């Protein structure tokens, strides 16, 4: 079965039913976005909660302060088309951007091309409105010590959430520091390391909710940070005879701080040569003559480097370095 909620109250009603009615306790509720995840996250034998049909409105945009408020069913391309005239965008850049919903992006803490400089979805979340398993609503924003203390005093399961999470991340701080790798892209799950280990050093439940795959709460509304569109972009194509050579060069290429690097192997290039797109990209993948002009080096692998920024001279230096 599929439920298409029209608002937060509908989500509350569904979750209240499954917790308060004994006959419904065994029913599993699975939130679904655009269904673009590759790990089968939205597959279930229970009830699918699909917010994409009705909860897909852009509620409020504040270009001066740089944020937007949306419902979880808004699609990434839909939002960025709305923002483009003001030369801003929501930075995480996913390949299925014409289908991926913002609610799904938060729940998987999605990132894509450009994540080296823009980070993950969670790095752009300012606030989340959520519905907990018993139907109670929870508002998540970064909290300083005084505000966190006030949130802990809230009645019901909401106050308990803030108490328990704060207790866990403080008591297990050494273990969290030891276990969680110092990498920008490493996991989807309960990101305990960022609850306090964020740039503002405040208690931030957004990082825990992001990437939790809907297992902690159902997101009903999002407030997201906007980013200025880069004025200039450059694409650099580096050709290789062997795939291993491209892998060895990766660390060197990263030092020039590209927004994205993508390496394409011989199998994909051979498929591209059989496709109608070949005429558009053939200059990127043809074999290269060596400087002597006598020998030809086979192009079996290419690395695509994208550079972007607002300073044209700086960008040209990056590309030519």
Region locations from a protein language model:
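A glycine-rich phosphate-binding loop feature that marks nucleotide/adenosyl-phosphate handling sites
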Residues: 36-38, 96-103, 188-191, 195, ...
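Conserved phosphate/anionic-ligand binding catalytic regions in large, soluble enzymes, centered on
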Residues: 35-38, 42, 105-114, 202-227
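Flexible, glycine/charged-enriched surface loops at secondary-structure junctions
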Residues: 25-28, 90-94, 170-189, 247, ...
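Short glycine-/aliphatic-rich beta-strand segments at the starts of folded cytosolic domains
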Residues: 229-242, 257-260, 299-303
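Terminal amphipathic helices with adjacent charged low-complexity linkers/tails
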Residues: 143, 222-224, 247, 254-321
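Short beta-strand elements
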Residues: 51-53, 126-130, 194, 207-212, ...
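N-terminal glycine-rich flavin-associated loop
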Residues: 1-25, 29, 47, 51-96, ...
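Flexible inter-domain linker/hinge segments
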Residues: 152-197
């Amino acid at each position: 079965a599929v439920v298409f909620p029209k608002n937060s109250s509908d989500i509350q009603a569904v979750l209240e039913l499954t917790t308060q009615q004994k006959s419904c306790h065994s029913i599993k509720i699975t939130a679904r976005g655009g269904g673009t995840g590759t790990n089968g996250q939205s597959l279930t034998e229970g009830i699918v909660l699909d917010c994409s049909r009705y909860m897909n409105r852009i509620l409020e945009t504040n270009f001066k302060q740089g944020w937007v408020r949306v419902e979880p069913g808004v699609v990434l391309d839909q939002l960025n088309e709305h923002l483009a005239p003001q030369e801003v965008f929501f930075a995480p850049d996913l390949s299925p951007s014409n289908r991926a919903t913002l609610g799904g992006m938060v729940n998987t803490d999605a990132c894509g091309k450009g994540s080296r400089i823009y980070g993950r979805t969670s790095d752009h979340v300012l606030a989340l409105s959520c519905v907990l398993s018993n139907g109670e609503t929870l508002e998540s924003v970064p909290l300083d010590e005084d505000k966190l203390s006030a949130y802990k005093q809230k009645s019901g399961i909401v106050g308990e959430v803030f108490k328990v999470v704060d207790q866990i991340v403080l008591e297990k701080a050494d273990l969290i520091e030891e276990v969680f790798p110092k990498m920008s892209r490493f996991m989807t799950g309960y990101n305990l390391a960022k609850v306090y280990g964020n740039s503002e050093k405040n208690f931030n439940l957004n990082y825990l909710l992001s990437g939790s795959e809907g297992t902690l709460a159902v997101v009903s509304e999002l407030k997201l940070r906007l980013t200025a569109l880069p004025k200039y972009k450059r694409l650099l194509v580096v050709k290789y005879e062997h795939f291993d050579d491209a892998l060895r060069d990766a660390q060197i290429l990263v030092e020039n701080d590209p927004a994205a690097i993508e390496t394409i192997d011989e199998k994909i290039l051979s498929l591209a040569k059989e496709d109608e797109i070949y005429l558009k990209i053939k200059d990127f993948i043809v074999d290269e003559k060596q400087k002597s002009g006598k020998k030809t080096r086979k192009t079996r692998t290419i690395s695509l480097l994208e550079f972007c920024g607002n300073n044209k001279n700086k960008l040209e230096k990056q590309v030519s370095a």
